[in-house]
């Protein structure tokens, strides 16, 4: 019964220490406590009026976690007041873990835990107990609920859930500078004993760092820790439960601490003198050497700025910082010349860009070194005496004329001769030549300033000893103008002078232009030609600024006397030889008002001095127009009246009858027929084709053969009808065509001699009636039944 005695002792300690308190008063139950047993009395079925002894009854049991004994762990005992110990009562258990974790003796009510329990897995179990009559299988009491708590033991060590840790702290920090706070957790019950009370300590990392035992805050323990001496620290932290007492469980973690850099070190050159060798042919801007100062700091604290201290040759060189390597790159600012100077010496200063004011007292954060540069001799190309040569030559200069020279020298020791030639790419047309030995430039073509005013080409000089070494220079040649063209008036001027002009008035400003040079390059003079200077009506006033004014010399001008004046103006330039030209200006006399504003320069102004106003002239013109209209109307009516007397009525139109007393064909006649063809029908005419109608067949021109009797008239009419059908000049509408042909071979010479026909009885004119109404007159005239009536002939 050792287990039961230990359990009783534990329960006594719990009660005596006040750790367990009654959860629920049960007035129906009686307290039956044995020093070595845990007993829960089930409520009995008694009268409510029966007086019972009051007391506190447990409704919970306790069981130790992690029990490893050979026998099941005794938990407690259930007992009913109705159980008399006769074996008639059966106890049952249900709820969490009933039958799997906990078992009950049905007869005695003893409860046992049949397996090891873990409080961290499940801290308590809720079960229900009931007493049942064995014989009747009926509950003797209502079901009662109770709790079994798993009693914690110190079986879990503290754990750092966030470990391992990484922290940083600036170098040179003072003692007590905050680094990091660590935290360990214990899975044991923090409300029971010291199983979950953790204490921190440092196992490795002293004396550099310290830790607060309760809070786990890590701080620096030494001042002025230098990153350049040691940058990384690994600190081992321990967390122990039970308040750090003996027997407590412990857990550890690692904290990696890095000292961050501060600018506490100045840059230092590893040596005081740097020697560099530079060829004299090094191009401007090229890097000729590198120097480096060392700064043990890191990042931006190690960024260095280099500067050349003013001194010998300092203006020929420059130094910049390479951001990747923090080296000082020395560059060439001006060309070097071995023949001029062979060595240069200057100092370079290196300093930090980002300073920390806390370390100013440590001294200046910069260092100085000396740089010595030796210039190496290089075989160089010739050097021209000028960077650009400008020359001038007159246009039309004879070919072969020397216009200038260039000079290049070899400045190296033991100089070589120089050869010259023109770069063919710049002077493709070969306007110039150069002497290869002397460098003289001459013309190779006749030059014309008006065509090309300026030439730009290059000359190359090479060493005879090394032709690959060449240099180039630009040549600019300006072609000077020879005064070839005389000046002329720049634009045509339309000059007018008022009739009421006064002497001395400027009526026009003229300017001149010269094709030789721009107007700003010459001075022009203006004057009248000698023949116009005699009793001039106008004169020229030279303003001495390449312009002149036309000035009046008379008091008033009359358009009736002279409407236009022609003024010859002589213009001379100032070049040599002097060129001049005579330009004739036309001056028109106009009518102006009193203010000099031109009112009219038209022809009607000539009539104004007669005394007629403009309104009177308009009235006269209207009258003339009306009279002309009346005359035209009268002539038209007369002609219409003559036409009306030609026919008896408008319906009776004799299309083939015309009057022969007309002296000439009217508009209708000339458009409708060719009078020449009618007068000479025997003339062969070309058959014309109409353009708007495609004829089925073309009629070839032929001469009408002479016909006997009256058949020639019929053939004549058929021939004219056919010609009109194919005539392209015929109008696109029906028109009246008249013919003057009376036939050939007739004995009658006129219409008045129709009665004298001797063979009238032999003539057959009945076919005329078949030709339609247009030939009705002829049919009536030559018909057999109707005699000739002289009253019908007009």
UniProtKB/Swiss-Prot annotation:
Biological processes per GO annotation: adherens junction organization; calcium-dependent cell-cell adhesion via plasma membrane cell adhesion molecules; cell migration; cell morphogenesis; cell-cell adhesion mediated by cadherin; cell-cell junction assembly; homophilic cell adhesion via plasma membrane adhesion molecules
Sequence intervals crossing the membrane: 610-637
Cadherin domain mapped to chain residues: 55-160, 161-269, 270-384, 385-487, 488-609
Protein name: Cadherin-12
GO CC annotation: adherens junction; catenin complex; plasma membrane
Extracellular side: 55-609
Residue numbers on the Cytoplasmic membrane side: 638-794
Positions bearing Phosphoserine: 787
Pfam family, one: CADH_Y-type_LIR
Flavoprotein found in the keyword field: no
Function of the molecule: Cadherins are calcium-dependent cell adhesion proteins. They preferentially interact with themselves in a homophilic manner in connecting cells; cadherins may thus contribute to the sorting of heterogeneous cell types.
Lineage: Eukaryota, Metazoa, Chordata, Craniata, Vertebrata
Annotated glycan sites: 256, 456, 537, 545
Record comment regarding domains: Three calcium ions are usually bound at the interface of each cadherin domain and rigidify the connections, imparting a strong curvature to the full-length ectodomain.
Entry keyword set: Calcium, Cell adhesion, Cell membrane, Cleavage on pair of basic residues, Glycoprotein, Membrane, Metal-binding, Phosphoprotein, Repeat, Signal, Transmembrane, Transmembrane helix
Tissue/organ expression: Brain.
Native source organism of the sequence: Homo sapiens
Signal peptide: 1-23
Propiece residues: 24-54
GO molecular function annotations of the record: beta-catenin binding; cadherin binding; calcium ion binding
Membrane topology reported for the UniProt record: Single-pass type I membrane protein
Top-level taxon: Eukaryota
Localization (cell): Cell membrane
């Amino acid at each position: 019964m050792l287990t039961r005695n230990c359990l009783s002792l534990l329960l006594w300690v719990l009660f005596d220490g006040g750790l367990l308190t009654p959860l629920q008063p049960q007035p129906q139950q009686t307290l039956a406590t044995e020093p070595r047993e845990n007993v829960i009395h089930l409520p009995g079925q008694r009268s409510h009026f029966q007086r019972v002894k009051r007391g506190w009854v447990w409704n919970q049991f306790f069981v130790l976690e992690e029990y490893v004994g050979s026998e099941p762990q005794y938990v407690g005992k259930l007992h009913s007041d109705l159980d008399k110990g006769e074996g008639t009562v059966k106890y049952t258990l249900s709820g969490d873990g009933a039958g799997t974790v906990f078992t009950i003796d049905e007869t005695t009510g003893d409860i046992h835990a049949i397996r090891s329990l873990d409080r961290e897995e499940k801290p308590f179990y809720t079960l229900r107990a009931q007493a049942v009559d064995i014989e009747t299988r009926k509950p003797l009491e209502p079901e009662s609920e109770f709790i079994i708590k798993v009693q914690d033991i110190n079986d879990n060590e503290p754990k750092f859930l966030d470990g391992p840790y990484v922290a940083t702290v600036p170098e040179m920090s003072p003692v007590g500078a905050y680094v990091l706070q660590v935290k360990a957790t214990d899975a044991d019950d923090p409300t029971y004993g010291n199983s979950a009370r953790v204490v921190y300590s440092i196992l490795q990392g002293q004396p550099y760092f310290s830790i607060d035992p309760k809070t786990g805050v890590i701080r620096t323990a030494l001042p002025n820790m230098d990153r350049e001496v040691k940058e990384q620290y690994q600190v081992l932290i321990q967390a122990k439960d039970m308040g750090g007492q003996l027997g407590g469980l412990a857990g550890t973690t690692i904290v990696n601490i890095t000292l961050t850099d501060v600018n506490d070190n100045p840059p230092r050159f590893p040596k005081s003198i740097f020697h560099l060798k530079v060829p004299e042919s090094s191009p401007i801007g090229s890097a000729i050497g590198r120097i480096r100062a060392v700064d043990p700091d890191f990042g931006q604290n190690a960024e260095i700025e280099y500067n050349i201290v003013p001194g010998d040759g300092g203006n020929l060189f420059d130094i910049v910082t390479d951001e990747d390597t923090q080296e000082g790159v020395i560059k060439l600012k001006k060309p070097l010349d071995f023949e001029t100077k062979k060595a240069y010496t200057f100092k370079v200063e290196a300093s930090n860009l980002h300073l920390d004011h806390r370390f100013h007292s440590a001294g200046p954060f910069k260092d100085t070194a000396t740089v010595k540069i030796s210039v190496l001799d290089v075989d160089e190309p010739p050097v021209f005496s000028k960077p650009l040569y400008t020359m001038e030559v007159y246009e039309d200069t004879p070919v072969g004329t020397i216009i200038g020279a260039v000079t290049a020298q070899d400045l190296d020791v033991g100089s070589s001769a120089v050869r010259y030639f023109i770069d063919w790419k710049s002077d493709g047309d070969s306007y110039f030549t150069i002497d290869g030995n002397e460098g003289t430039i001459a013309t190779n073509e006749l030059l014309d300033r008006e065509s090309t005013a300026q030439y730009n080409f290059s000359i190359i000089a090479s060493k005879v000893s090394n032709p690959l070494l060449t240099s180039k220079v630009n040549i600019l040649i300006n072609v000077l103008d020879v005064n070839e063209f005389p000046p002329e008036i720049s634009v045509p001027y339309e000059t007018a002078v008022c009739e009421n002009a006064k002497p001395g008035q400027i009526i026009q400003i003229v300017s001149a232009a010269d094709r030789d040079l721009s107007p700003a390059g010459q001075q022009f003079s203006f004057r009248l030609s000698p023949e116009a200077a005699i009793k001039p009506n106008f004169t020229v006033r030279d303003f001495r600024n390449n312009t002149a004014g036309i000035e009046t010399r008379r008091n008033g001008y009359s358009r009736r006397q002279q409407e236009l004046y022609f003024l010859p103006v002589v213009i001379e330039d100032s070049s040599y030889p002097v060129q001049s030209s005579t330009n004739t200006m036309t001056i028109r006399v106009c009518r102006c008002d009193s203010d000099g504003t031109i009112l009219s320069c038209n022809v009607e102004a000539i009539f104004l001095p007669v005394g007629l106003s403009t309104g009177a002239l308009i009235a006269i013109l209207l009258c003339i127009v009306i009279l002309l209209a009346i005359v035209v109307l009268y002539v038209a009516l007369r002609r219409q009246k003559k036409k009306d007397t030609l026919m008896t009525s408008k319906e009776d139109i004799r299309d083939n009858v015309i009057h022969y007393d007309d002296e000439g064909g009217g508009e209708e006649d000339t458009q409708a027929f060719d009078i020449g063809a009618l007068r000479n029908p025997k003339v062969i005419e070309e058959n014309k084709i109409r353009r708007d109608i495609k004829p089925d067949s073309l009629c070839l021109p032929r001469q009408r053969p002479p016909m006997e009797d009256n058949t020639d008239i019929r053939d004549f009419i058929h021939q004219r009808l056919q010609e009109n059908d194919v005539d392209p000049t015929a109008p696109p509408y029906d028109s009246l065509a008249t013919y003057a042909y009376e036939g050939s071979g007739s004995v009658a010479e006129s219409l008045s001699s129709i009665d004298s026909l001797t063979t009238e009885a032999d003539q057959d004119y009945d076919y005329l009636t078949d030709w339609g109404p247009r030939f009705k007159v002829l049919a009536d005239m030559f018909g057999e039944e109707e005699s000739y009536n002289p009253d019908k002939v007009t």
